[in-house]
């Protein structure tokens, strides 16, 4: 970790009243959580991810929400929903590693070497988006980080897939069936993790509605467990801590300059470190997110641009 002993910053604006920055993540009131929070939702089967996000928007009284990675209507599981200003950070899920549990339905009895066949797909694979996809149908590479058989029957496998964002699990199941010589299709599919969110902290729509009702009666405990500070979605990114005066300049649209940098450090979750051209989150000394940006130069320099602004979060 690089630490700086000086907290100089450029003067900002002409107002005599400095703007108020967000409170530390663990000290926010419920209104602040609702306007800059994230719900790790257990998406039910049936509605689309967009429909579910709209329900949460209406239930929480926010003008805007976003979700962290779409799920088809029949797919269940981990769907982080970003509330209010947190919707600006939805891009952090674009390249997040995803994990799924799926049923592989073989069209004939599994061959004796099915485990070896499955293991061959734990690599970079090539896929073309399906005809109904919203993206251009061109061949592209996707990494399968791990592929484990959790259960096995004569014609059915329960698989856990950890993969790059944008992997088509249905196509993966089809290709495994071809390699096995039996043919196969995907059965049930559930997402168990996306980025730093997993199925260990999921909440249902019913949980959220009940918690909102309790909060309206003065009991905030359940809602505070469900709506997490938005910074939770950024814990996999390297951090650049900046002075409050520099944070106020960012709020006015300025990037982060070297004199305003206090220190840099690795991600709270994972092993990402602040490298040139890497995505970083700039935070205040008490941990409140200020902006997403790209580290463009040495943060220990005496002058110059350090973090180019991608998304303002204040």
Swiss-Prot record:
It catalyses: uridine(55) in tRNA = pseudouridine(55) in tRNA. Residues 1-30 are annotated as: Disordered. Could be responsible for synthesis of pseudouridine from uracil-55 in the psi GC loop of transfer RNAs. The active site is at residue 72. Belongs to the pseudouridine synthase TruB family. Type 2 subfamily. This is Probable tRNA pseudouridine synthase B. It comes from Haloarcula marismortui (strain ATCC 43049 / DSM 3752 / JCM 8966 / VKM B-1809) (Halobacterium marismortui). The gene is truB. The keyword Zinc does not apply.
């Amino acid at each position: 970790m690089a630490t700086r002993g000086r907290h100089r910053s450029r003067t900002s604006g002409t107002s005599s009243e400095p703007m108020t920055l967000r409170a530390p993540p663990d000290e926010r009131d419920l209104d602040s959580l609702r306007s800059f929070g994230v719900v790790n939702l257990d998406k039910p089967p049936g509605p689309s991810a967009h429909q579910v996000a709209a329900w949460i928007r209406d239930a929480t009284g926010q003008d805007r929400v976003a979700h962290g990675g779409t799920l088809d209507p029949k797919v269940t599981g981990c769907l982080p929903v970003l509330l209010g200003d947190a919707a600006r950070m939805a891009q952090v899920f674009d390249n997040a590693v995803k994990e799924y549990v799926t049923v592989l339905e073989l069209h004939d009895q599994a061959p004796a070497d099915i485990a070896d066949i499955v293991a061959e797909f734990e690599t970079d694979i090539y896929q073309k988006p399906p005809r109904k996809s919203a993206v251009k149908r061109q061949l592209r590479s996707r990494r399968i980080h791990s592929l484990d058989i959790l259960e096995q029957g004569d014609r059915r496998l329960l698989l856990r897939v950890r993969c790059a964002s944008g992997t088509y699990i249905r196509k993966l199941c089809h290709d495994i069936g071809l390699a096995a010589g039996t043919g196969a299709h995907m059965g049930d599919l559930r997402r168990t993790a996306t980025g730093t969110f997993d199925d260990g902290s999921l909440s249902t729509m019913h949980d959220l509605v009940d918690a909102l009702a309790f909060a309206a009666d003065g009991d905030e405990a359940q809602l505070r467990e469900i709506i997490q500070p938005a910074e939770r979605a950024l814990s996999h990114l390297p951090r650049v801590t900046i002075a409050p005066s520099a944070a106020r300049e960012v709020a006015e649209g300025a990037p982060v300059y070297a004199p305003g940098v206090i220190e840099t450090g690795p991600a709270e979750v994972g092993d990402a470190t602040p490298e040139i051209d890497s995505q970083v989150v700039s935070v205040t000394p008490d941990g409140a997110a200020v902006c997403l940006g790209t580290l463009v130069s040495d943060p220990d320099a005496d002058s110059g641009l350090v973090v180019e602004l991608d998304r303002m979060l204040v």
